Amino acid sequence: MAKSADIRPGITLACTECKERNYITTKNRRNTPDRLELKKFCPRCGKQTVHRETR
């Protein structure tokens, strides 16, 4: 049987403006095979920016 880490891998989210990696989360590969893009607060920029999944 597949482990939960295979289906829900850990990913990091990086700010698109300053490229700092601010957030760590998991995602379900079956539901979202493409890269995540979430609007989150970046402490370095001091505002909400788009954070993209990095590998």
UniProtKB/Swiss-Prot annotation:
Ribonucleoprotein listed as a keyword: yes
UniProt cross-references to InterPro entries, sorted A to Z: Ribosomal_bL33, Ribosomal_bL33_CS, Ribosomal_bL33_sf, Ribosomal_zn-bd
GO biological process terms, semicolon-separated: translation
Claim: Oxidoreductase is one of the keywords in the record: no
GO MF entry, a single one: structural constituent of ribosome
Alphabetically ordered keywords of this record: Ribonucleoprotein, Ribosomal protein
GO cellular component: cytoplasm; ribonucleoprotein complex; ribosome
Name of one Pfam family that matches: Ribosomal_L33
Family under the similarity heading: Belongs to the bacterial ribosomal protein bL33 family.
HAMAP family, per the entry: Ribosomal_bL33 (MF_00294)
Name of protein: Large ribosomal subunit protein bL33
Species this protein is from: Bifidobacterium longum (strain DJO10A)
